[in-house]
């Protein structure tokens, strides 16, 4: 960096997000294995994917880890808008592509964070076929790519929806407790897709020794959620901001903790 230049923060004007990133960098997370490595993040413009990109870039700035971040995006314009300052800083390389097609990238890749997925409940219902194919074909392409690159590690971002509907008398569930999922409901395109992809990951680990781990995420929200996001928490927030009544389409008996 030349004298007089100001190094931009990862989250630009969002001070809350920036404080969160720097707090994580100052913690004792076991991050040194990524030093000097290349990390591919799919779904990089999404809520979780973008946070991964920002966090790794923050490690580069604060700890000089020299992680090469490959942000895979479908929309090049959106990717440049979100990460242009990090591209200019040399932290991020944009890889424009669709996970539903084979991944084309000539350089080495050491780690993969696979977060590309359909995320809107409305989309699951209106486009169940695409939801399923994005999960299965998309992750299959990423796993094939991981096999070719002989990666050191991969994380697949799954969902608590793989647990289905638990028994009514169950106070707590473990990772080994799986409830019912209605296979004939188009809304199940997401949860059944996630279940099948977890099996696909386990199969690649068994047959091709791909070092893939699975993280089952709960409802995820925070700074960076798009205003038009179709999930229920975003609709509640919009109703509050726009002073509209909240309209429930169920009896409201579902409980999450």
Go through each PLM region and give its residues:
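N-terminal Rossmann/SDR dinucleotide-binding element
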Residues: 2-111
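SDR active-site strand-loop-helix element
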Residues: 42, 72, 112-116, 154-160, ...
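Active-site helix adjacent to the Tyr-X3-Lys
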Residues: 47, 51, 187, 191-199
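Hydrophobic/aromatic anchor residues within beta-strands of the central parallel beta-sheet
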Residues: 94, 131, 154, 212-215
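NAD(P)H-binding glycine-rich loop region in Rossmannoid oxidoreductase-like domains
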Residues: 96-134
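Conserved Rossmann-fold NAD(P)-dependent oxidoreductase catalytic core, especially the SDR/UDP-sugar
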Residues: 133, 140-188
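Conserved catalytic Lys-bearing alpha helix of Rossmann-like short-chain dehydrogenase/reductases
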Residues: 136-142, 193-201
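NAD(P)-dependent short-chain dehydrogenase/reductase
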Residues: 166-176, 189, 199-257
